[in-house]
Design a protein with these regions (language model features):
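Blade-loop segments of beta-propeller domains
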Residues: 47-122
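Fungal secretory targeting signals
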Residues: 1-24
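Short loop/turn segments immediately following beta-strands, especially the blade-tip
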Residues: 37-45, 88-96, 137-148, 195-203, ...
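Short coil/turn segments that connect the beta-strands within blades of beta-propeller domains
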Residues: 22-23, 69-71, 120-122, 178-180, ...
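Loop/turn-rich, solvent-exposed surfaces of beta-rich toroidal or solenoidal domains
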Residues: 279-354
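A short beta-strand motif characteristic of beta-propeller blades
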Residues: 49-56, 98-104, 149, 157-163, ...
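Asp-box/WD-like beta-propeller blade repeats and closely related beta-sheet repeat scaffolds
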Residues: 96-172
Length: 396
């Protein structure tokens, strides 16, 4: 095979045509487009290319949720004007996307996850940031699909960060390891909302929410289980956008009651002795093996257009996290990132740079390495604006 670095785009696409199982990624952009990317790796180098551009996902496609078993893809719409939609697509074996259904949504959706049904994939729940609500739909999505439920929240006054905590702002939804509970960090209310799932109907019943630190602004979360096949010792790690930190929570399952959380520690997304730069915001969090990763937006730690990602190690016995290092995310304003199934590559999506960067990861040490590929996708965004790349996921 020719060296990737010597390939022209035409040659690269030819190579990809012969590599049916080459890795791929899916990207959403606030310009109203979805993109299917190809990625091929040659040792310590790689190359990304756009295979398909599709106008879909509403006015502001904001998040991608993929069922890799069936190739079904759902896209939420953050726009609150016009006619916001929830879109379902089918992703072919070659990465080509095709819309299979759309349904009217409330708008303001910034994140979604599958839950319920017989296999944990019968419904989809979306966090609606500006509407202060969480809505859910039965799958599959068609033109006649109606929301199963819409839960709307209020609060009596502003939070400690008054400019951002003017009202409840649910920012994500995700299920616990048992699939029996749905959680939704609320940035505006400083809460982690917890719901019991009725699998057959998709109904969500509120449990007692967990209270975060004042002004933390919880955004996303990721679970960790110390031993496969057991929920004993389960931990939840929440990234706090306003606090620029990650909090560790123990997870308990009382007999006859709801899932409960207890916070054990909060650790900065920056090294000891370094304060979060003015205007920086922590974004997404993921767990891989015994490591936690959280991205920082607008910290410019590695240059005017290069932000950082924090790595933490997890203590097996306690679930406590220790800051390891901050490394280059090779993107500006990384709103989104995902680790591949093999655990050896990380895809970062820069909202403002509108670039996808592929970075190597050591599966033993957990440390992130050099960038091996980078691609501009769509048009660049403006600093502080929601007009660039919104999400990137591996298609695997």
């Amino acid at each position: 095979m020719a060296s990737i670095r010597s390939c022209t785009p035409a040659i690269l696409l030819g190579l990809l045509a012969t590599l049916g199982d080459a890795a791929g990624l899916l990207v959403s952009h606030y310009n109203g487009n979805l993109y299917s990317l190809s990625f091929i790796q040659d040792g310590n180098t790689g190359q990304l290319a756009v295979k398909q551009t599709l106008k879909a996902g509403g006015g502001m496609p904001s998040w991608l949720t993929l069922d890799s078993d069936t190739g079904s893809l759902w896209v939420t719409d953050e726009s609150t004007y016009g006619s916001p939609v929830l879109t379902q697509l089918q992703v072919g074996s070659d990465g080509t996307m095709k819309v299979t259904g759309t349904s009217k949504s409330n708008g303001g959706e910034v994140h979604s996850s599958l839950y319920g049904g017989s296999n944990g994939k019968g419904f989809i729940a979306a966090a609606e940031y500006d509407p202060s609500s969480i809505s859910s739909w039965k799958l599959p999505i068609t033109g006649n699909t109606q929301a199963v439920q819409k839960l709307t929240y209020t609060m009596s006054g502003r939070g400690p960060v008054a400019s951002r905590q003017d009202k409840p702002h649910p920012h994500s939804t995700f299920t616990d390891p048992t699939g029996k509970y749905l959680l939704a960090p609320d940035l505006g209310a400083d809460l982690i909302r917890i719901f019991a799932i009725e699998a057959s109907s998709g109904k969500l019943t509120a449990c007692t929410a967990a209270k975060t630190g004042g002004g933390d602004g919880p955004r996303h979360g990721a679970f960790w289980i110390p031993r496969a096949g057991s929920i004993d010792g389960t931990m939840l790690y929440i990234v706090n956008e306003l606090g620029n930190s990650v909090s560790a929570w123990t997870v308990s399952y009382p007999s006859g009651g709801c899932l409960t959380l207890a916070k054990t520690q909060t650790v900065s997304t920056y090294p000891t002795g370094k304060s979060a730069p003015n205007g920086s915001k922590a974004a997404e969090v993921h767990v891989a093996g015994n490591f936690v990763y959280a991205v920082n937006r607008n910290d410019k730690s590695f240059g005017s257009t290069s932000d950082s990602v924090a790595t933490y190690s997890i203590t097996l016995e306690t679930g406590a996290i220790t800051f390891v290092e901050a490394t280059n995310a090779y993107t500006y304003y990384p709103r989104t990132f995902q680790i591949n199934k093999a655990g050896d590559l990380v895809a970062f999506g820069g909202q403002t740079s509108s670039t996808v960067a592929i970075v190597q990861r050591n599966t033993t040490t957990g440390r992130l390495g050099p960038q091996i590929a980078n691609l501009l996708v769509g048009t660049r965004g403006g600093a502080g604006n929601e007009d660039g790349l919104s999400a990137v996921i591996w298609n695997e």
